[in-house]
From Swiss-Prot:
Residues the UniProt record annotates as site (Cleavage): A85, G86
Residues annotated as the enzyme's active site: S120 (for autocatalytic cleavage activity), K157 (for autocatalytic cleavage activity)
Keyword Transcription regulation: yes
Protein name per Swiss-Prot or TrEMBL: LexA repressor
Length: 201
């Protein structure tokens, strides 16, 4: 399939979410409302482009005549709160939206996205505003990039286990590593970062 523009991706996500939550596709006006536009002409152009690229089929004369191609291959994952790539940040919570990806990219259930804030992981090519795809798991191997909870606060860092301590290493020399000595602080692994998604302007 051809690559989508950012706006076409947004339209496809709106349709996918509506199908998953309501069981039927949205109308043109419902799509327009979620895009923040008043008319439906722009929506029709996006749908036409999506149809030409093979992402959906339209049924003329029906207000909800949209069918996704390979619908079973799409997965709409929650974007959960914010994780700060830098300083520690209050615990992960709150769903701020959803983002659709190909189901083949998921090795297991329960995956979710976290939106990155801060610049402590820039040398790992993770920047502010990125969506980090997190696979929930309670353990990590050395050099894994993880979302970790330290004393109830979440951070995104590279994981190292060293003798009697854990080191959460930033990928930016302007930041110090977080060192957790055995028994000093409570630390748990929320999950491993298995992908980064970025919207291009």
């Amino acid at each position: 399939m051809e690559q989508l523009t950012a706006r076409q991706t947004e339209v496809l996500q709106i349709i996918t979410r509506h199908l998953e939550t309501c069981g039927y596709p949205p109308t043109l006006r419902e799509i327009a409302a979620q895009l923040g536009i008043s008319g439906t002409l722009g929506v029709m152009k996006h749908l036409e482009a999506l149809e030409k690229k093979g992402y959906l089929r339209r049924q003329e004369g029906s207000t909800r005549g949209i069918t996704l191609c390979n619908q079973s291959q799409a997965a709409s994952l929650p974007i959960v709160g914010v994780v700060r790539a830098g300083l520690l940040h209050p615990a992960i919570q709150d769903i701020e939206g959803h983002f659709a990806i190909d189901r083949s990219q998921l090795a297991s259930g329960g995956a979710f996205f976290l939106r990155v804030k801060g610049d402590s992981m820039v040398h790992a090519h993770i920047v502010e505003g990125d969506l980090a795809l997190v696979r929930p798991q309670p353990h990590a191997s050395n050099r894994d990039i993880v979302v970790a909870m330290v004393d109830g606060e979440a951070t995104l860092k590279r994981f190292y286990r060293e003798a009697d301590r854990i080191r959460l290493q930033p990928e930016n020399p302007n930041y110090e590593p977080i060192i957790i000595e055995k028994g000093e602080q409570e630390v748990s692994i929320v999950g491993k970062v298995v992908g980064i998604y970025r919207q291009m302007e």
